[in-house]
Regions:
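Short S/T/G/P-rich N-terminal loop/turn motif that feeds into the first structured element of a domain
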Residues: 1-47, 53-67, 74-94
Length: 94
């Protein structure tokens, strides 16, 4: 069963979407992930939905994820304001 993590992040100024795309691309080869979606809520806030292959894959990725989050906070002053996570129990595919 896939595992979904949804977060909201606050930036100190307008988002640098080009830099964010470069950062996100670093996760492309991560075998634990199915996909990551980042979306704009407003010019200084973005949402993220990360889909992992399973809860075990999420847990295997946790140390790397914590490291990335710390860097985002320490270097770029981006702060997480919300997190929700859980196993996916239904998927609508068109």
């Amino acid at each position: 069963m896939q595992y979904v993590v949804s977060t909201i992040w606050k930036h100190p100024a307008d988002m640098d979407k080009d830099r964010m795309r470069e950062v996100q691309a670093q996760w492309r080869e991560n075998g634990n992930l199915v996909n990551i979606y980042w979306f704009e809520i407003d010019s200084t806030t973005h949402g993220s939905v990360s889909i992992f292959k399973s809860r075990d894959a999420f847990e295997a990725n946790l140390a790397l994820q914590k490291e990335h989050r710390k860097k985002s906070t320490d270097e770029y002053r981006i702060t997480m304001t919300h997190e929700a996570q859980g196993e996916c129990f239904a998927v609508l595919q068109g």
